[in-house]
């Protein structure tokens, strides 16, 4: 109730990558709590090519990124926002935050990330622009002296503990993006399962064939 009263009629500029429809769920929840949300994908496009370039060599499309954020400034110039809410901050440029701060001095800048800074270092360079900063990574919270906020779950899972138990098909299940040491660690666990009569299933998500080929050739953890 307190949160609903606080967000009632507040205008929020929400920037987030598109990830398994979570950005839509967040937007809908904020609106359910009474906020008026203007959403933009953090990336200039959501195709696998752009995702791959951002991860491998962002400078190749930096001009396009800057133009995209200049357009956001123009499109939102007539709206007086109460909050800027950036989720993840993978490519949000510093000039955008500086210009928005000048144009909207009463707007509070809030940052949250559900990714570790070891996977995406760019957000570290823009943290200084935010009034409130949160991360799901407890190590990053300590290292960078920012607020720790554990990863959330959707309302649809609130009552999952009360549902009827299902027979498990697998003893070990991994679903996630293949980055850092995840593939190496999960492969070790799969081998352990095979040697001890346990069942396992792993599904690795990657941002397109370009990223996969790069990892396969240059990243030893994928050998």
Give names to the regions the model predicted.
Residues 97:
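Short alpha-helix within the catalytic core of nucleotide-sugar-dependent glycosyltransferases
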Residues 2-56, 67-71, 88, 94, ...:
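Nucleotide-sugar donor-binding catalytic core of glycosyltransferases
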Residues 116-117, 123-124:
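Conserved nucleotide-sugar donor-interacting segment of glycosyltransferase catalytic cores
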Residues 59-65, 86-89, 110-116, 220:
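Short, flexible loop segments at the rims of nucleotide/cofactor-binding pockets, characterized by
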Residues 100-116, 134:
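Active-site proximal beta-strand in glycosyltransferases
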Residues 80-82:
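Proline-aspartate-enriched helix->loop->beta-strand connector
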Residues 76-77, 101:
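Short hydrophobic patches on amphipathic alpha-helices
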């Amino acid at each position: 109730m307190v949160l609903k009263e606080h967000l009632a009629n507040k205008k929020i500029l929400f920037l987030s990558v598109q990830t398994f429809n979570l950005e839509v769920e967040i937007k809908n929840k904020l609106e359910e709590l009474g906020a008026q949300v203007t959403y933009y994908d953090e990336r200039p496009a959501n195709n696998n090519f752009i995702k791959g370039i951002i991860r491998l060599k962002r400078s190749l499309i930096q001009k396009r990124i800057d133009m995209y954020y200049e357009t956001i400034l123009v499109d939102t110039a007539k709206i007086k926002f109460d909050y800027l809410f950036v989720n993840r901050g993978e490519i949000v440029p510093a000039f955008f935050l500086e210009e928005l701060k000048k144009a909207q001095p009463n707007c509070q800048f809030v940052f949250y990330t559900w990714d570790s800074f070891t996977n995406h270092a760019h957000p570290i360079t823009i943290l200084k622009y935010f009034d409130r900063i949160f991360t799901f990574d407890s190590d990053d919270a300590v290292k960078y002296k920012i607020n720790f906020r554990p990863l959330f779950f959707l309302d649809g899972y609130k009552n999952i503990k009360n549902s009827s138990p299902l027979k498990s098909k697998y003893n070990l299940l991994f679903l996630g993006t293949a980055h850092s040491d995840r593939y190496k660690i999960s492969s070790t666990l799969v081998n352990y399962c095979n040697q001890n009569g346990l069942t396992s299933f792993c599904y690795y998500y990657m941002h397109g064939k370009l990223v996969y080929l790069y990892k396969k050739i240059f990243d030893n953890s994928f050998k």
